[in-house]
Design a protein with these regions (language model features):
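Membrane-embedded and interfacial regions of multi-pass energy-transducing membrane proteins
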Residues: 2-107, 111-466
Length: 466
């Protein structure tokens, strides 16, 4: 097709002429209409729907502050800690940039956890939004990697020994584990080579992947449309112009709405940065203000709070826990075998149960702890196919479903708390019970999600004007 210059009306302003010139070469106005002013979102979105926008803002904060930190940071084991102190003491407003970055890391996980919780209770992972959910889980996985690689960079005591513990976990993988952990470290111990590797991953590799996944997440969302608290597809009810009857343009209605909540969020964010940047040791640990010492292990090594639920599951997987864990998994597989009609599926369930029995006998608890910790994240990718409920939203599910979700949230919080605490026999038992419930919530979902009496779902969204 031949190139055509976009025409402007006579007497158009200079700005209109410039925009027409740009649009002829890059469809900026068309993209704005498609993704903002003519993107129709359900009119009954509530408080839980602000966290996606907040996550984008925090991502921008992290990228901008990270750029300024890298200008003065030295990825050298002999200079890393001193360079952070130099940023804090000598660089103009360096303390502010560093505290914004460290606070942003924790707040990123706060808004992402809330964003995922909203998707969980309102069924935002159900058809046709499976790909949106998968991209979201991939973002979460990348975010965990980004946080882990960045955690080593201050080269403090907790950074050093935390990295040592986590990298050593890879050695538990049969056959390839020792070589894999050696490749990650770049040496036989965490040192200068490790720091340079982690710096490259944290500053270049993962941010590029993260930005790409965020773009894919948003594009997939705008292709199928946003979910809503009722789980009703607004595209099923269109007006004469082909617009959803229960939808409103994202801009200006939700963009202005989100700006109001963004103001409140930034007040909280600034309050933490200026008055409690360490948050009692949860955002910045006291041991990380001590230079890394390979010859002195801290009395208690614990990850940052946003990793602790998964770390708690890792620590709960002891030798004594393997038998109860196998019994639990065998029961789940037995339920799948009973439900399945195909004899091949029944046989596969029995074979998996026997293979797990052999694996629990031959492989040590450390390996299975790594499997449980990794599996607890990976299992979220399969949520769209685990939930067999006839309705999406928790609003129309049986009452006991709400209790199942509520106990799941409490279990996750308990695991997070126990992951910070020093190990003890009592905490170990509680962690094991919570681990079983966490896994059971997902693995048994095909069964419990279909039980009970479901409320009728309305044909249109429920909405009350303010």
């Amino acid at each position: 097709m031949a190139f055509q210059e976009k025409q402007v009306p006579p007497g158009a302003s200079g700005a209109q002429k410039l925009m027409a010139w740009v649009d002829s070469r890059l469809p900026v106005t068309e993209a704005f209409k498609r993704h903002m002013s003519e993107y129709y979102a359900p009119k009954n979105l509530n408080f839980f729907y602000i966290f996606g926008a907040l996550a984008i803002v925090v991502l921008a904060i992290q990228i901008i502050t990270g750029i300024f930190l890298v200008m003065n940071y030295k990825p050298d084991a002999a200079k890393a800690f001193e360079s952070v102190e130099y940023i804090m003491r000598e660089v103009p407003f360096g303390w502010l940039i560093r505290y914004m970055h460290s606070t942003g890391a924790s707040m990123f996980f706060v808004v992402v956890y809330m964003h995922m919780f909203r998707g969980l209770i309102y069924g935002s992972y159900r058809k046709p939004r499976e790909l949106i959910w998968i991209f979201g889980c991939a973002i979460f996985l990348c975010l965990m990697g980004e946080a882990f690689f960045g955690y080593l960079l201050p080269w403090g005591q907790m950074s050093y020994w935390g990295a040592q513990v986590i990298v050593n976990l890879f050695s538990a993988i049969p056959f390839i584990g020792p070589d894999l952990s050696l490749w990650l470290r770049g040496d036989y111990v965490v040192g200068d080579a490790t720091l340079n590797r982690f710096f490259a991953f944290h500053v270049i590799a993962i941010p590029l992947v993260l930005i790409g996944l965020v773009a894919a997440h948003i594009l997939a969302l705008h292709e199928v449309g946003s979910n809503n608290p009722d789980g009703v597809e607004i595209k099923n009810n269109l007006d004469a112009q082909g617009h959803p009857v229960d939808g409103i343009p994202f801009h200006p209605y939700y963009s202005v709405h989100d700006v109001m909540y963004l103001g409140g969020f930034l007040i909280i964010f600034a309050s933490i940065v200026f008055f409690a940047p360490e948050m009692g040791g949860y955002f910045l640990e006291a041991n990380n203000f001590i230079p890394a010492n390979p010859f002195q292990t801290p009395s208690h090594i614990a990850p940052v709070w946003y990793f602790t639920p998964f770390y708690s599951m890792l620590r709960a997987t002891t030798t004594n826990f393997l038998l109860p864990l196998w019994i639990f998994l065998a029961v789940i597989l037995g339920m799948f075998a009973i439900k399945a009609k195909d004899i091949k599926i029944k046989g596969a369930c029995v074979a998996i149960a026997l293979a797990l029995a052999g694996g629990f006998y031959l492989l040590d608890a450390k390996f299975w702890g790594v499997v449980i910790m990794g599996g607890s994240v990976v299992i979220m990718f399969f949520l769209p196919w685990l939930d067999h409920s006839p309705v999406k939203s928790i609003r129309y599910r049986p009452a006991f479903h709400k209790y199942i979700y509520g106990v799941f949230v409490v279990t996750f919080v308990i695991l997070g708390y126990l992951g910070i605490q020093p190990p003890s026999p009592m905490f170990e038992k509680i962690s094991q019970i919570c681990t079983i419930y966490y896994l059971g919530f997902f693995l048994a979902m095909p069964f419990w999600s279909t039980l009970g009496t479901f409320k009728p779902v309305p044909s249109r969204v429920t909405f009350e004007a303010h």
